[in-house]
Amino acid sequence: MEMDASGASRAPISVLPAAEVKSTLKPEADKPRCSSTPCSPIKSTVSGYQILHMNSNYLVGFTTGEELLKLAQKWSSPDSSNTEALPSPIKKPVDLGLHRASRIYKAKSRYYQPYDIPAVNGRRRRRMPSSGDSCLKSIVSGEPSKALHGPLPLCLLKGKRVYSKSLDYLNLDKMSLREPVDTEVLQYQLQHLNLRGERVFTRNKT
């Protein structure tokens, strides 16, 4: 008889008979390996739920036993054609989804090429033209009206200048000369304010 440090006996006490213990442990082993992947290929049933159909994206539709009975009653009718078509709703979505996915994949690999393709003149060009390409082409061909009014939004066209203020720092010729003067004036005023404040503070101290 093994004894624990606290004095309690450590002998295993079996309340259920061996057959019952085995029966209780069985569903644990039958469950899928991971709870987040109920569509694992081990079993199609997950603790009372049966997988009704599985998508090509592994989206699974579950149904309980009661729902399955209702569906069976709905499908069952005197016509033999309906009874023959019973298993088809379960198989169809899987097959259709897989075929559809493979077809799309084939079409994509054949026709859709978004990556760069080398051009004739040696430069690499894009397969799919961006929105700015038409603007650049019209500027090069000498049609500024098309270039401005085509791809640009209305908010930029309504203003006096088409270009944003951030571009002014790049265009040094067009930059206004008032800005440095303004900053100097502001700095001067700030210094005077600080000096006045310091003087008042020293006066109050003495």
UniProtKB/Swiss-Prot annotation:
Recorded GO CC terms: ciliary transition zone; cytoplasm
Keywords, in A-Z order: Cell projection, Cilium, Cilium biogenesis/degradation, Cytoplasm, Inflammatory response, Protein transport, Transport
Highest taxon of the lineage: Eukaryota
One GO biological process term: negative regulation of cytokine production involved in inflammatory response
Phenotype of null mutants: Morpholino knockdown increases the recruitment of macrophages in response to injury.
Record-linked InterPro entries: UNC119-bd
Pfam families, per the entry: UNC119_bdg
Compartments (UniProt record): Cytoplasm; Cell projection, Cilium
Tagged with keyword Transport: yes
Function text: May play a role in immune regulation through regulation of the macrophage function. Involved in the recruitment of macrophages in response to injury. May also play a role in trafficking of proteins via its interaction with unc119 family cargo adapters. May play a role in ciliary membrane localization. Regulates the macrophage function, by enhancing the resolution of inflammation and wound repair functions mediated by M2 macrophages. The regulation of macrophage function is, due at least in part, to the role of C5orf30 in regulating ability to inhibit glycolysis. Probably plays alaso a role in trafficking of proteins via its interaction with UNC119 and UNC119B cargo adapters: may help the release of UNC119 and UNC119B cargo or the recycling of UNC119 and UNC119B. May play a role in ciliary membrane localization via its interaction with UNC119B and protein transport into photoreceptor cells.
Record text on subunit structure and interactions: Interacts with unc119 family proteins; interaction preferentially takes place when unc119 proteins are unliganded with myristoylated proteins.
Record-stated family: Belongs to the UNC119-binding protein family.
Protein name (database record): Macrophage immunometabolism regulator
